[in-house]
């Protein structure tokens, strides 16, 4: 069992090495839009999971997730060799690639928040012209305040303790 801090440092280094190799050394066109977002290494330092995202060629085009996964699987051996040569550890971790779903979840949450904001704006527009169904203050009785203040003056004037 290795130190968790060492596993984190190793994961960061593996992420950097693999990202650099994908960008500059591996010439597979399926990996052109692949970005390594995170890496996790098990505490025994034998397995590394690399999380990746894929960018589409344009904003309207859906990314090719299957092609990127196939390209990463094909390049896995070369990438592991590069990681082993760069790290200088006794055992080079096996590499596994997993698609990072955080950006997709973030887009879905942004869409839900935009929908909620639009609903709030619609409700605010409806409220601006709205009036209460009944009177402005249905519990207020006109004239009741005058009677209550008159009763208080009468009670204050006749104090039987002073006599």
Curated annotation (Swiss-Prot):
- Compartments it resides in: Cytoplasm
Region feature Disordered, mapped onto this chain: 124-163
Q: Record's superkingdom?
A: Bacteria
A Pfam short name: RBFA
Record bears the keyword Plastid: no
Q: Name one GO cellular component term.
A: cytosol
**InterPro entries associated with the record:** KH_dom-like_a/b (IPR015946), RbfA (IPR000238), RbfA_dom_sf (IPR023799), Ribosome-bd_factorA_CS (IPR020053)
Q: Name one GO molecular function term.
A: ribosomal small subunit binding
- Which family does the record claim for this protein? Belongs to the RbfA family.
UniProt protein name: Ribosome-binding factor A
Q: Which organism was this protein described from?
A: Mycolicibacterium vanbaalenii (strain DSM 7251 / JCM 13017 / BCRC 16820 / KCTC 9966 / NRRL B-24157 / PYR-1)
């Amino acid at each position: 069992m290795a130190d968790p801090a060492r596993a984190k440092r190793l994961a960061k280094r593996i992420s950097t090495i693999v990202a650099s190799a994908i960008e500059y050394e591996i010439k597979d066109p399926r990996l052109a839009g692949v970005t390594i977002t995170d890496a996790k290494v098990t505490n025994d330092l034998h397995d590394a999971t690399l999380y990746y995202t894929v960018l589409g060629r344009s904003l309207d085009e859906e990314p090719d997730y299957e092609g990127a996964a196939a390209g990463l699987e094909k390049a896995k051996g070369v990438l592991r060799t590069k990681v082993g040569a760069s790290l200088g550890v006794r055992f080079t971790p096996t590499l596994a690639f997993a698609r990072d779903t955080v950006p997709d979840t973030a887009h879905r949450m942004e869409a839900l928040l935009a929908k909620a904001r639009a609903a709030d704006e619609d409700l605010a527009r409806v409220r601006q012209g709205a009036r209460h169904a009944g009177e402005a203050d249905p519990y207020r009785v006109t004239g009741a305040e005058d009677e209550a203040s008159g009763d208080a003056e009468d009670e204050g004037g006749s104090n039987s303790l002073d006599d």
